[in-house]
């Protein structure tokens, strides 16, 4: 009888090769809005070859979702009860869970989408921390965030815009989806469907970028191409559009340029463009149709960096889909770091402003200018003019000007709601000058 030879497990060859490519992309939903969007993506099954993750302070919200990978943020900070709409609590909860986040991302992840609804507590406060952890690990980090509908109120909108500025500093590229822009386009939609449309729009953004990487094309685009465009790209624009029939490529380009994803940004100011053209089997892309693409690209500056590709999608039939990913905008098109004052360029310290307490912010004229800029950028000039109100500024009289009728008239001639700090300062200076003149 032959002796049975048992080989150590380490000497055996494993012929069970993996049948699926390991996912290098994670889509992470932070907070209630981000979690709803990621749950929507997961259930729709629209995005292939990615991993979905939920991060929330609200344990009940995590339990309700069917997304399998979940992290409860700040078990000690919030005890699973949520952030109560306070971003600082969301931030502290995420800081408590940094170790869990690092472990989550230490599996070969190359790219992370951080999705959140700005304006609440967890999404606004925790999403920048989650993004920072990913970016510090060398992962290509893309934020996709929504900002509120106007009917959600001034306080939430301003809180959301502060959150946008905070996460912008912690991602390679940031896509901002303005829910109010969706309302303008789909004006006849009911409230539940309006929020669902916001989830759909966010899904389209993540899906379009992911498929550039995961779907093999004829002129193939891959992670390296997306990385070139998005790495340290700042504010990004992602948009796509479908075209059908005669001049379908031009129609797709037109629809791309009128997508709600553009959020009123001018795509032609970009320095880097990734252009992907996808077509179906019924009517493949013709060489003649590339003339329409050439005409479109001719509208950009000649020094723009362009990466382009083509791919087949059988579901498109005779449609053509154009996807544009654009970055490299000038800082003046993104954040008001400077403004002209008295003929000189003045630097606005937005970073310091963001970190001040709520009460201090509301009393700061620089903060008010900054908020007005952001409201104008995302919601339009008419909105910004009506949404931020200057708080009444008192004029403090002293013994020297209590009986100065000219100063008294200057103060009472301006209603309290029109009294800015600068106006009160000018009156005070005038009073001091008059007092000095009398003393002489």
Each language-model region and where it sits:
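Tubulin/FtsZ superfamily GTPase core signature
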Residues: 1-440
């Amino acid at each position: 009888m032959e002796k049975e030879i048992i080989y150590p497990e380490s000497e055996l060859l494993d012929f069970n090769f993996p049948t699926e490519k390991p996912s290098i992309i994670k889509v992470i939903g932070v907070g209630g809005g981000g979690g709803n969007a990621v749950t929507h993506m997961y259930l729709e099954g629209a995005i292939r070859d990615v991993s979905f993750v939920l991060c929330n302070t609200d344990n009940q919200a995590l339990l309700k979702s069917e997304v399998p990978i979940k992290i409860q943020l700040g078990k000690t900070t919030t005890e699973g009860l949520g952030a109560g709409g306070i971003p600082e609590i969301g931030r502290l909860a995420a800081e408590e869970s940094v170790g869990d986040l690092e472990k989550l991302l230490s599996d070969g992840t190359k790219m992370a989408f951080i999705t959140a609804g700005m304006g609440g507590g967890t999404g606004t406060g925790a999403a920048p921390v989650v993004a920072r952890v990913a970016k510090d690990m060398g992962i290509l980090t893309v934020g996709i965030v929504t900002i509120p509908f106007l009917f959600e109120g001034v306080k939430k909108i301003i809180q959301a815009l502060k959150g946008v500025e905070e996460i912008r500093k912690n991602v390679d590229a940031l896509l901002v989806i303005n829910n109010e822009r969706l309302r303008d386009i789909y004006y006849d939609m009911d409230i539940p469907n309006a929020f669902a449309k916001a989830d759909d729009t966010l899904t389209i953004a993540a899906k379009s970028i992911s498929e550039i990487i995961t779907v093999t094309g004829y002129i193939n685009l891959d992670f390296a191409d997306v990385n070139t465009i998005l790495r340290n790209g700042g504010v990004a624009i992602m948009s796509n559009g479908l075209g059908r029939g005669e001049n379908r490529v031009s129609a797709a380009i037109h629809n791309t340029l009128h997508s709600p994803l553009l959020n009123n940004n001018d795509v032609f100011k970009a320095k880097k463009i990734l252009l992907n053209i996808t077509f179906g089997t019924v009517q493949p892309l013709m060489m003649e149709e590339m003339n329409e693409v050439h005409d479109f690209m001719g509208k950009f500056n000649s020094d723009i960096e362009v990466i382009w590709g083509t791919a087949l999608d059988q579901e498109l039939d005779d449609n053509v889909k154009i996807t544009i990913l654009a970055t490299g905008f000038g800082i003046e098109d993104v954040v008001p770091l400077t403004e002209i004052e008295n003929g000189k360029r003045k630097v606005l310290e937005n970073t310091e402003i963001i970190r001040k307490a709520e009460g201090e912010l509301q009393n700061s004229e620089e903060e008010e200018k900054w908020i007005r800029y952001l409201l104008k950028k995302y919601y339009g000039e008419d909105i910004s003019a009506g949404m931020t109100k200057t708080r009444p500024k008192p004029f403090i009289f002293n013994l020297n000007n209590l009986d100065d009728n000219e100063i008294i008239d200057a103060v009472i001639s301006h209603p309290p709601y029109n009294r800015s700090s600068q106006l009160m300062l000018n009156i005070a200076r005038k009073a001091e000058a008059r007092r000095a003149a009398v003393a002489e």
